[in-house]
């Protein structure tokens, strides 16, 4: 393989890794039956005159499988933290215990599990679309090089095969990540 092909594949790999990371971030926001600090990541608290991420006003811990605790550093914002979690749309009902906000994670209903699985499926499909978009860019670059006679038709075939192989690997990664998340969501 030529250095130019290696450079192109390295660039495409970097961009496809970005699509995978984006998918993982999106899926981490979906609530499964287990407690996870990532669950509270999107929560923003009205504190100190502006909205700040929950992680900037306290530390999040998982003392039990179905319980999160937020140890708030400044007692003046404990009420705001509790309110922000309650109003977050995550279906959580926190309670305050001194400077600690306890957040029990309720069991998911079958209907809610199915909704979350559909949302995970949409995220996975968006991940595949991103990977395919990167592949399309790589194919266009390859065709442009062939058109300018910088690579031969044989080289173009080698390059497109390498790009397709890389794409297939990343599509499989997306499918595997989705399958794991779906299994986690469906687990009672």
Swiss-Prot record:
CDD domains: RRF
Cysteine disulfide links: none
Predominant localisation class: cytoplasm
Subcellular location, record wording: Cytoplasm
One Gene Ontology term of the molecular function aspect: ribosomal large subunit binding
InterPro entries registered for this protein in UniProt: Ribosome_recyc_fac, Ribosome_recyc_fac_dom, RRF_sf
One biological process term in Gene Ontology: cytoplasmic translational termination
Keyword annotations from UniProtKB, A to Z: Cytoplasm, Protein biosynthesis
Pfam families for this protein: RRF (PF01765)
GO cellular component: cytosol
Function: Responsible for the release of ribosomes from messenger RNA at the termination of protein biosynthesis. May increase the efficiency of translation by recycling ribosomes from one round of translation to another.
NCBIfam families reported in the protein's UniProt record: frr (TIGR00496)
Family membership: Belongs to the RRF family.
The protein's name in its UniProt record: Ribosome-recycling factor
Source lineage: Bacteria, Pseudomonadati, Pseudomonadota, Alphaproteobacteria, Acetobacterales
